[in-house]
């Protein structure tokens, strides 16, 4: 959200059309094409709010919390000096984080293969109907001004299949939907003025909708 609106418009074209336009020329982006972005929800000075159309094109929006005590200790350990990297104009202290981009964890072929495996994960008709029900509930809830678009359902199915594969399954289960609903849905909905005035939060409203759906059964 620190990018200017013109830059955000260019990114929207890349995310939606998988291409970029420079002047009168248009260039197709290589595949697979992924966008990972960070946003500071607290510091708003010098930022530009992302339009709903652009937020909707992010499959997931994961909200980070403060690290635990053990995690923070590990961060400090990894950030300790690992020597000095000499450059033409001097030198800088190196940390383990500086070496992340030098440690490849997979290849282009590995990513394509994983994408193919995700598409083979089975989604039952019952699961699909529950996804549609949840998305529709966001459009009918009295506290929500802007409900989720059909892209939310598409993203929830994709994310559920990926989660199933990560957990060693070739089919989705209800736990996938409940585990991913917040990351897939929250950034796509907007509470109305009355709900905000009452101090309600999107996560609370979403939990109400999930609780009201009852048990999800059937994986075949």
Show where each model-derived region lies.
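Canonical AAA+ ATPase core
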Residues: 2-3, 7-10, 15-120, 161-163
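C-terminal engagement/docking regions of AAA+ P-loop ATPases
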Residues: 132, 137-220
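Short conserved motifs of the RecA-like P-loop NTPase core
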Residues: 108-115, 128-130, 134-140
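Short, surface-exposed acidic/glycine-rich loop or hinge patches that mediate macromolecular interfaces
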Residues: 1, 41, 66-67, 151, ...
